[in-house]
Amino acid sequence: MKRDEQARPLKPPTSVPEQIELLRSRGMAVDDELASQWLEAVLYYRLSAYWYPLRRVDTEEHVEDGFVPGADFADVVALYEADRKLRTLIHDGMERIEVGLRSRLTSLLCRDNALGYQERRFYRSGFDLDGWLRAARRRVDRAGAHNTAIDHYKKQYGGQYPFWVLSEVLDFGDVSKLYQGLTYKAQAQIAETFGITIDLGALSKNERKIVRRRHPLASWFEQLTIVRNTCAHHGRLWNKSFVPASTKYVRTIPGLESLPDGQSERIYGAVLFMAHLLNILSPGTSWPVKVNNHIANCFLTLPMVKAHSLGITSNQTIHPGS
């Protein structure tokens, strides 16, 4: 890789003891044993995102290297662990949402034909169905003989895969894109089974045009795809902006009233929306309570965590639970 001559030189690598002394010299309280364990297991760079709010800010809003009084490495570890456990909870919820979307697409697209998902009548004129099918074929090829069902349909049916078989090798991004490509009528039918009903009659002509162009659920599935992939790659959820999802047309739905006005781009908005979907998919689920309690007890009790870093707005109250 060619180096840009104008670029600054990279900082030299440092040892764990050097990193500990650097943190201490900048004003952080550090227990050597705890810090050594975490800096070796997780690395300085990965942890640095979690101590960022503890850095001092000067009068011109410039972030300095030094830490604010009271900065403690133990709090950084607690925040990192809270984020890791939140990823586990999100992954668990997304599994059920992903399977639920697959099943609804199967019911719609394969009602009369196992290969109905290949018929253009279900899709918008601008949707690249051929491109989507090529991408799906690559998923099938990668699964190959290691997937019993794929291997069976390849040998017995000449490589023709009903959607209920194909969907098992697709990821959430694949099925989300397929949903985005559906006609508005098809999108609305599926959305209603998730408890997302848009009253077009209550909208202005321009608003109806916007909703028909892209159903709000498609916007949310796009965001949830990124959230899911962030979890799959062990990325940070706290204090991070995701692709925004419009809230304008869903805030009238019971359970979604407290979403931010206009759009939502932080993890708590995604949590609220997931909770709504999961209450439909699995009535009586304990997932919303578990996530609410985790956020209240493990995030909001830490000194450097502000509610807005999670996307919790002034009209949302999170109470600690057991």
For the regions a protein language model found, what residue spans apply to each?
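Long, contiguous internal "core" modules enriched in hydrophobic/ aromatic residues
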Residues: 1-322
